[in-house]
Each structure stands twice: as C-alpha cells, then as structure tokens.
C-alpha cells in the first residue's frame, strides 16, 4: 500500500483538497458502523460519477491494517479510509489512490467525551459542500482552531439565519424535550447520528435557546457526548439524555450488531 509521503506535491489531493474519506472507530478488530461508513463513501462517489476503489481490495487493506495494529479486544483506534486524487485526470481510475491506516484517537477527542464546550463559529465560515465527506477541510480545520483559541473543544457552524448546523467534525443534535432534532439541511449525513436517532427525529432550526435546554454531539471517534456549555454559558444536561447517551455508547463499543469484525 502506498503511503501519504508518496503523494506528488502537485496532486489534486494536495493542491485542491480533492479526495474523500471515512474515519471508522476500531475496537480491537471490530469496525464500528462499518457498513454505513462504506455506504456513505461509495454513495458519494456514485452521486458525482467518480471512480471507485475496488471493494474487495478495500476490505483486504482494512484487514491488513487491523493485522498490523494488533489491538487488544477493547482497545480503540481510528481506521482511516482515504480515496484521494493523485493524478491530473479525475476520470481515470489510475489517478486515484486508496490509503487505509490505523491511527491513535486524538487526546482532544478523548477529552471531549466527558462533555463538549462548544463555540459558535463566525458566520462567514462554512463548508463548501456540507453534505459530502471530502478532504477539502479548510472550514473544519479553521473552525476547530477558533474554538480552541476561545477555550472550547468544538466549533459549531451556523446557517445564514443564525441557527446551528453541525460541528467541525461532529453532528449536532438538540434533545428537544426527548424528541431529538437535527438541522433540516446544510449538514453532513452523519453515520453515528443516524445510529443514535434510529430514524426517530425532527428537522427543526437549531437555535441557541433550544441547544441550551439540552444538546449532544455525535462522531465516529467522539461517540455521543452532551454539550455542557455553549460560548461559555452552561447548558442543561437532561437526565434522560444522559441515560440514552450512555446506553448508545455502550452499544457502540460492544454490540456485535453495530460493528463488523475485520
């Protein structure tokens, strides 16, 4: 397997952020929500008509990466699947390359699991194509930097009307009195959030007032976590939300139905 150091400096992936990726939670050899992650990756490529990685080769690469990592059964890592453009002709499969790597979960992500201190991002900072999981990641990188400089651990993008959309690397859900709600549009279709919601959700504008009455973030490595503060002001953390988060995270880490053995 080629390594990132082999990518030419003038590759579309480097110069233009041309590529797609998925980050999968790996618990031992168990890839959490593996099939939904693959469905999102291949669905995006088919939607735009880009060449696709050979699925058996991808699965073999993932198993090889898991072999090399040799994780104990309960140890967690991030499994990164990256399909990046290294050649100039995007119509040619030979211009694309698959990289599969196992990485430590960032300490900042692990710290967020105890409760997120979210920061509202400036209105002019937004993703170029928010419903696509691409490597064009300026807004996310800049947004997280802004949040950290403000004393937070996650930045929240907003819509033109001021309502909230999602985090830089997480999905945003309002507890909404026990009927969880997401933004109607303008956010990535999150694999982890979909598993948490199980099809039961409302689509409503996520206002600051609504979030302060109870909200959570979902991400493949973050898991589900309560938002404990927004722009420095404490948020309510309803007990029922806490219970559901705890049960969901337990299932993510241990339920065979929510993972695939590599």
Region annotations inferred by a language model:
Residues 59-89:
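Short, acidic/charged, Gly/Pro-enriched secondary-structure junctions
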């Amino acid at each position: 397997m080629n390594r990132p150091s082999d990518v030419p400096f003038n590759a579309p992936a480097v110069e233009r952020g041309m590529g797609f990726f998925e980050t999968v939670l790996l618990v031992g050899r168990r890839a959490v929500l593996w099939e939904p992650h693959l469905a999102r990756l291949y669905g995006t490529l088919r939607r735009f008509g880009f060449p696709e990685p050979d699925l058996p080769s991808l699965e073999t690469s993932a198993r090889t990466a898991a072999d090399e990592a040799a994780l104990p059964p309960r140890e967690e890592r991030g499994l990164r699947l990256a399909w990046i453009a290294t050649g100039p002709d995007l119509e040619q499969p030979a211009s694309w390359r698959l990289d599969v790597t196992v990485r430590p979960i960032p300490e900042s992500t692990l710290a967020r699991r105890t409760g997120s201190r979210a920061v509202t991002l400036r209105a002019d900072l937004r993703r170029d194509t928010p419903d696509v999981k691409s490597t064009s990641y300026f807004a996310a990188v800049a947004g997280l930097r802004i949040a950290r400089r403000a004393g937070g651990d996650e930045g929240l993008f907003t819509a033109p009307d001021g309502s909230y959309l999602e985090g830089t690397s997480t999905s945003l859900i309002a507890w909404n009195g026990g009927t969880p709600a997401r933004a109607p549009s303008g956010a990535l279709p999150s694999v982890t959030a979909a598993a948490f919601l199980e099809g039961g959700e409302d689509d409503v504008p996520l206002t600051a007032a609504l979030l302060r009455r109870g909200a959570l973030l979902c991400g493949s490595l973050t898991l589900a976590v309560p938002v404990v503060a927004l722009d420095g002001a404490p948020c309510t953390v309803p007990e029922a939300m806490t219970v559901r988060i705890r049960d969901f995270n337990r299932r993510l880490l241990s339920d065979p139905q929510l993972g695939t053995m590599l």
